[in-house]
Amino acid sequence: MAEAKTVTVRQTGSPIRREKDQRATLVGLGLNRVGRVSTLQDNPSTRGMIRKVQHLLEIVE
């Protein structure tokens, strides 16, 4: 069985003074502190969440 594609993201920005939905999106991605790294399945819903808070994230290669 083929291994599922994944994407790894690191939080680079603080959720302080951000809209409530952006903070909730970070929590949904498993991020709640600057510098935290999370590996997620690469699917359209995850990509949409990443795009919503892309200014607070960095894609880790």
Curated annotation (Swiss-Prot):
**Which Gene3D superfamilies has this protein been placed in?**
Ribosomal protein L30, ferredoxin-like fold domain
Which UniProt keywords are listed?
Answer: Ribonucleoprotein, Ribosomal protein
Q: Which GO terms describe its cellular component?
A: large ribosomal subunit
From the Swiss-Prot or TrEMBL record, what is one GO molecular function term?
Answer: structural constituent of ribosome
Repeat: present as a keyword of the record?
Answer: no
Please give the superkingdom of this protein's source.
Answer: Bacteria
The record's similarity note reads:
Belongs to the universal ribosomal protein uL30 family.
Q: Note the subunit structure.
A: Part of the 50S ribosomal subunit.
**Descriptive protein name:** Large ribosomal subunit protein uL30
Q: Which organism is it from?
A: Caulobacter vibrioides (strain NA1000 / CB15N) (Caulobacter crescentus)
Give the source lineage, highest ranks first. Answer: Bacteria, Pseudomonadati, Pseudomonadota, Alphaproteobacteria, Caulobacterales
